[in-house]
C-alpha cells in the first residue's frame, strides 16, 4: 500500500489523461506509465443526495488504483488516499470508512485493499539486500570524536577531577548521543538513496520503505544493522 501511494517528486508534468481505471491499468500493463507517474484522471463517488458525481484530479496512477477500491460515500474523499500511506495512515483510512460507511463496507474495503496490496507487492519485487543497508559517511568521524572525548574523561578521572561514577555516566551519555547521531545520519542517507533500473524506473531504498511504511523493521533495528554494529 505504501509502495502504491508513493509519488515521484521530480515528476511535475502529468504523463497522460485517463477517463477510467481500465485505461490506467492498460497503460500500466503497456509500461507507458508507472505506478508513481503523475496523471490526470477521475474519481467516481456520490454526493449527499446519493447521486453519482465525477471529480477530476491530478495524482499518481497508484493512488487512483487505491481510490478505486474506496466505498462510494459523500464523506469518503479522494484526499483520503491522495498521500503517502504508512501503516498509521492506512489505519486512519479504515477508521474513517468504518465511521461513515459501517462494518460491512469496511470489511469489503479491507479485503479489496489487501488483494490490491498483495498483487502489487508481488509485482514490485521489493527485497532486502546488503547493498540496501547504507553506512553513513560521517560514522567514522563521529566515533573517533567520541573516543577522543572518552580519553579526556579518563584523564579527568586520573587527575582526580571527577569520580568513577561521574566518569561512567559521562561515557554512557556520550556513547548514547553518538549512537543517536549515527542513526539520524543513516536515516537521512538511506531515505534519499535511490535505485535506477534499466527501464529508467527510480525506486526508493527497499529497507527504508519497509521501515518507514511500518510494514517490518524499525529505525532501531536499522541502526544496529548499518549504524553502530554494522
Identify the function of each model-found stretch.
Residues 1-165, 221-230:
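Feature marking long nucleic-acid-engaging regions of large polymerase/nuclease enzymes
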Residues 165-226:
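Gly/Pro-rich turn-and-neighbor structural signature
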Amino acid at each position: 500500500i505504501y509502495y502504491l501511494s508513493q509519488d515521484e517528486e521530480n515528476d511535475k508534468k502529468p504523463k497522460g489523461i485517463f477517463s477510467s481505471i481500465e485505461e490506467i491499468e492498460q497503460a500500466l500493463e503497456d509500461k507507458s506509465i508507472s505506478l508513481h507517474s503523475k496523471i490526470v484522471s477521475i474519481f467516481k463517488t456520490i454526493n449527499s443526495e446519493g447521486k453519482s458525481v465525477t471529480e477530476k484530479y491530478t495524482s499518481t496512477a497508484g493512488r487512483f488504483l487505491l481510490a478505486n477500491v474506496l466505498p462510494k460515500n459523500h464523506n469518503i474523499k479522494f484526499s483520503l488516499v491522495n498521500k503517502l500511506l504508512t501503516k498509521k495512515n492506512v489505519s486512519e483510512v479504515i477508521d474513517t470508512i468504518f465511521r461513515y460507511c459501517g462494518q460491512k463496507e469496511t470489511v469489503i474495503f479491507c479485503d479489496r485493499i489487501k488483494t490490491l496490496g498483495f498483487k502489487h507487492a508481488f509485482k514490485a519485487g521489493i527485497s532486502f539486500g546488503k547493498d540496501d543497508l547504507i553506512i553513513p559517511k560521517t560514522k567514522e568521524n563521529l566515533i573517533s570524536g567520541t573516543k577522543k572525548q572518552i580519553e579526556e574523561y579518563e584523564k579527568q578521572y586520573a587527575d582526580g577531577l571527577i569520580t568513577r561514577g561521574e566518569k561512567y555516566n559521562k561515557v554512557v551519555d556520550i556513547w548514547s548521543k553518538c549512537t543517536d547521531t549515527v542513526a539520524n545520519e543513516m536515516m537521512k542517507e538511506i531515505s534519499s538513496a535511490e535505485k535506477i533500473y534499466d527501464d529508467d524506473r527510480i525506486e526508493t531504498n527497499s529497507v527504508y520503505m519497509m521501515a518507514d511504511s511500518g510494514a517490518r523493521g524499525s529505525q532501531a533495528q536499522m541502526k544496529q544493522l548499518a549504524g553502530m554494529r554494522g
